[in-house]
Amino acid sequence: MSTIDDLPPLREVIQRHDLSARKSLGQNFLLDLNLTTRIARAAGPLEDSTVIEVGPGPGGLTRALLALGAKRVIAIERDERALGALAEISAHYPGRLDIVCADAMTYDPRPLLGGARAKIVANLPYNIATPLLIGWLETDPWPPWYDCLVLMFQREVAERIVATEDDEAYGRLGVLANWRAQTKMLFDISPAAFVPPPKVTSSVVRLIPRDEPEPCNRRMLEQVTAAAFGQRRKMLRQSLKSLGVDPARLAAAAGVEPTRRAETIPVAGFVAMARELANIRGIKSEC
């Protein structure tokens, strides 16, 4: 039996349900229940919370969330082979686990929430982790339907999420993430903790949505960061030419020196340039 509940060990569950990880689904199962518990705890108190989990697989993190008292867990799993293992967990925690067999890239869990906000806690499949996060960060209207994200990524991606100006990993993802949320790298997880072990170290990141991010039009922000980081080694007066406006005037009007490079501009600078671009184009700046 496990250390967090009296359900069978995860290795036994995987063997009984023939849950060999599939590379095509980006699966790497985390079997150490001490680590899954640590991830679940990072989301804060769970007793009054509904938690969305993406890609539960054999249910290691699912079990940790429920054992720590999550009021309700909605597990979104594309792999039908895992449904039997998840059903066993549901029987052990009656009325607290909803299992949804769907592709998280297209499935919208909000109708299940009844207007309440949720936490999203997941060991995300590597092959969909970044687009899922971007989709959640681009949620409109804002504040979003979730109040906390605790997610596992490849360390390289995690570094991009939490990066700020002058960091080597700073780019479009860091601007979007830190504009709309407070981000923090929590801890690393060795490849040896997974079955099969990935080739890279994984990292757990927590994002807390900002109630009121600096106002700007999100699409204008995307265009500014795409232009600036698309030629990140060039000065803004050159890299922003693709926007179809005078780049030096755009930057200067936003209070940003046109001779600076994208990697040195803080999030507030990009937001200011996005607002100025929206003004030039006659587009509403509020997000």
UniProtKB/Swiss-Prot annotation:
GO terms for molecular function: 16S rRNA (adenine(1518)-N(6)/adenine(1519)-N(6))-dimethyltransferase activity; RNA binding. InterPro entries: KsgA/Erm, rRNA_Ade_diMease-like_C, rRNA_Ade_Mease_Trfase_CS, rRNA_Ade_methylase_Trfase_N, rRNA_adenine_dimethylase, SAM-dependent_MTases_sf. Keywords: Cytoplasm, Methyltransferase, RNA-binding, rRNA processing, S-adenosyl-L-methionine, Transferase. Pfam families: RrnaAD. The gene is rsmA. It is found in: Cytoplasm. S-adenosyl-L-methionine binds at residues 28, 30, 55, 77, 103, 123. It comes from Rhodopseudomonas palustris (strain BisA53). It is an enzyme of class 2 (transferase). It catalyses: adenosine(1518)/adenosine(1519) in 16S rRNA + 4 S-adenosyl-L-methionine = N(6)-dimethyladenosine(1518)/N(6)-dimethyladenosine(1519) in 16S rRNA + 4 S-adenosyl-L-homocysteine + 4 H(+). GO terms for cellular component: cytosol. Its main location: cytoplasm. Its EC number is 2.1.1.182. The keyword RNA-binding applies. Belongs to the class I-like SAM-binding methyltransferase superfamily. rRNA adenine N(6)-methyltransferase family. RsmA subfamily. This is Ribosomal RNA small subunit methyltransferase A. Specifically dimethylates two adjacent adenosines (A1518 and A1519) in the loop of a conserved hairpin near the 3'-end of 16S rRNA in the 30S particle. May play a critical role in biogenesis of 30S subunits.
